[in-house]
């Protein structure tokens, strides 16, 4: 697999912008989707090999606004050691969930940066605040809800493949 170069990155960002514009055109009466889209699983065909050190300035991350808050895709790809990864940041409005509880084959770490969330751990609610981390293990039912009075901000690191 080829390494990600500047040209590939520009094409990927343009594709992401096109996807975001298409998502916004399929909006609710308020101009926003009702539920945040779950990113495609890590390790999908065509994902780049993440074999170069780099930084991801927050101000450069593309923003997709939704009725529940917003998301910022950071990166996705395959590490040289074979693990598929995807990283995004979510801002969740008070009282909202990004989507209903669900499960999938890949695992996810959720790192809470700001706010108070309730992690649905196979039907058992657990509170997490700033600095807290939740692990959604492979095929475990899980979900998040902002139970605080301010926005909740958290990063999701998805590891693994769906097939």
Feature-to-residue mapping (PLM):
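Histidine-centered metal-chelating micro-motifs
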Residues: 97-99, 118, 134, 139-143
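N-terminal secretory signal peptides and thylakoid transit peptides that target proteins
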Residues: 1-17
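Glycine- and acidic-residue-biased ligand/ion/polar-headgroup-sensing regions
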Residues: 105-107, 111-117
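Conserved short histidine dyad/triad with adjacent acidic residue
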Residues: 88-103
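Ligand-binding loop in jelly-roll beta-barrel domains
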Residues: 138-163
């Amino acid at each position: 697999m080829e390494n990600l170069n500047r040209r590939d990155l520009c094409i990927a960002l343009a594709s992401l912008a096109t996807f975001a514009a298409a998502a916004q055109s399929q909006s609710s009466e308020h101009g926003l989707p009702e539920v945040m889209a779950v990113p495609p699983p890590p390790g999908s065909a065509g994902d780049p090999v993440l074999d170069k050190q780099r930084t991801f300035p927050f101000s450069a991350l593309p923003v997709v606004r939704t009725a529940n808050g917003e998301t910022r895709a950071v990166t996705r790809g395959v590490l040289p050691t074979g693990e598929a990864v995807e990283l995004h940041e979510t801002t969740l409005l008070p009282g909202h969930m990004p989507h209903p509880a669900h499960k999938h084959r890949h695992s996810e770490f959720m790192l809470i940066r700001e706010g108070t969330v309730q992690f649905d751990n196979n039907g058992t609610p657990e509170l997490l605040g700033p600095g807290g981390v939740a692990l959604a293990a492979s095929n475990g039912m899980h979900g998040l809800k902002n139970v605080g009075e301010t926005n909740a901000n958290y990063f999701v690191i998805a590891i693994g493949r769906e097939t």
